[in-house]
Amino acid sequence: MAQKHPGERGLCGVHHSGGSSLITSGSSVDPEILSFSGLRDSKETAPNGTRCLKEHSDPKCTQPPNPAHWSDPSHGPPRGPGPPREGGYPDESETCSEESGVDQELSRENETGYQEDGSPSFLPIPSACNCQGSPGVPEGTCSEEGDGSSSSFCHHCTSPALGEDEELEEEYDDEEPLKFPSDFSRVSSGKKPPSRRQRHRFLTKEDVRDSGRRDPKAPGRHRLARKRSQTDKRRGLGLWGVEELCQLGQAGFWWLIELLVLVGEYVETCGYLIYACRKLKGSDLDLFRIWVGVWARRLGGWARVMFQFLSQSFFSVAGLFIRLLRVVGAFLLLALALFLGCLQLGWRFLVGLGDRLGWRGKAAWLFSWLDSPALHHFLTLLKDSRPWQQLVRVIQWGWLELPWVKQRTQRQGTAHVASGRYCQPEEEVARLLTMAGVPEDELNPFHVLGVEATASDIELKKAYRQLAVMVHPDKNHHPRAEEAFKVLRAAWDIVSNPERRKEYEMKRMAENELSRSVNEFLSKLQDDLKEAMNTMMCSRCQGKHRRFEMDREPKSARYCAECNRLHPAEEGDFWAESSMLGLKITYFALMDGKVYDITEWAGCQRVGISPDTHRVPYHISFGSRVPGTSGRQRATPESPPADLQDFLSRIFQVPPGPMSNGNFFAAPHPGPGTTSTSRPNSSVPKGEAKPKRRKKVRRPFQR
């Protein structure tokens, strides 16, 4: 803490904690200015034990102040001595008396404030040192640091706990710092500064003695600070709430004022508008009409220009798009033509290579084998076999057991039930009434419940509950709902009872077996009839070959490569046509007014015909050869057809020989070999001789 000594013009320092404190005496001189200007000051000791730096009044050692500090108010309070008068520098005694008067007034006000506050730990700051020049104050010894500075101090001027006060200043940085007399001297003497509560604590003699025993700066110890009382905390909380309310009130007040100002502006604008409308004249209306017409014409012109611009841009874009489509279409057609041309060239190359390597005959044989009836018959038998059906069931079960397939099936089934049963109970009643006349033994419970025969008990129970809710007489007001419910109940009785359900399943299996056997017999009979109607006898292999009816008219049956058109055909005409770029040759014949494909028969006969010729190369007459006659003759109408003869022999197990002359029940004629062999055994009775049946041997199809 620093204070001014009016008797001297120098800087006095009071030491605490090994340091020195500076005070100004005389006029208020800034320490920074002194540190740079007073380079030749001497060091002395004051009578009260303080160290003083005497300032020489030599003008050579003192730098004159800058006059700009006195003329420009933005530089803050003046530093150093005042501006020089006309006669030179001001008198030192007058300056000291004026400053001491100001300091006395400030110290009195501070003392009065401290007494009102009631805090005994704060002492007033006197304007002048009372112990100045008093011999009663003993001089202290040197400090413990040994730097030669005096450890004695004036307790009226400063406090040894100044370091702790500085720490308190940092702790309470939101409060006003203490004003020193050097700062008070800068305040104009015409105005009285407001008194402020001092936050620095000045210790008494007992506190100083106690603090002298321990080092306040000792490391490892906590520094004690003044604690706020509960009253101060409560007062702070109350002040905080009041301040918040005040701020909210101010904000609301200013918002209300701004709202009133805004409303006033709008009212003023409306008033101006009404006033301007009242001042309008008839000529103003004409001018307004003219102005509207001008702007309407301008807007119309702008709209017309914009429409023309948009239409032109649209047509240009559409034209570009159409051109682009044409170009893309041309490129696609070109690419397609190139692709087809490459395919044709590649196919021709492969055909030529196959002809040279001899693969053409093998390829034709492979195609004919794939289209052979033996392969189709084998595939049919494979599909009808039980292992194949079990394999298909296992595959279907595994596919349905997949998680995503099961979820999709469940969703579809739920939606179907919800849409078909819950929404349309009348249709369910009508469906059940159609089965009301069916006897209970013949009733199909699964069909009644609308589920599959492989449904589980849970699914059956769920279906029964859903249907019972819809067709029950208490729920459905249909006049015949009771009959429908009886049908449903009968089906449920069959399914719910395990014994009755087992009996029904066995009965159903027997019926299915019988129906399946009958169906197999009928299907086989139908196939035999079709085969008998669509087969041809072969004199080369003594077998039969199938023929296929073609969807062609006799008037346009034959294709001619020379004319590139279809020519008419006559009964018995036999020709050939090529397909698949000449790899496959098909043989046709006109029989019974229909065109048939007889490729199998022609292949077995090894007939070589040039395909797609203009004239018919062969003419077929279906008949039997008569010994002793040359050529072919038509069969007599008395003998039955060969196909029907073979069909009847297969059904009734009769050899085809007895039917050669048209008599189905005629006795068999002995063969040419039987006459020679029967002569030695002529004594054998007639009833013991049993004729041998000839078995018809089918030879495999050969190309």
Curated annotation (Swiss-Prot):
Residues 75-84 have a biased composition (Pro residues). Residues 89-102, 164-176 have a biased composition (Acidic residues). Residues 1-150, 164-229, 622-643, 659-703 are annotated as: Disordered. Residues 203-218 have a biased composition (Basic and acidic residues). One of its GO terms (molecular function) is G protein-coupled receptor binding. Residues 444-508 form the J domain. GO terms for biological process: protein transport. Pfam families: DnaJ, Jiv90. Detected in heart, brain, lung, liver, skeletal muscle, kidney and testis. Keywords: Chaperone, Endoplasmic reticulum, Membrane, Protein transport, Transmembrane, Transmembrane helix, Transport. It comes from the Eukaryota. It is a multi-pass membrane protein. The chain crosses the membrane at residues 254-274, 305-325, 327-347. Gene3D superfamilies: DnaJ domain. Residues 17-28 have a biased composition (Low complexity). The keyword Protein transport applies. Interacts with the FxxxFxxxF motif of DRD1 via its C-terminal domain. This is DnaJ homolog subfamily C member 14. It comes from Rattus norvegicus.
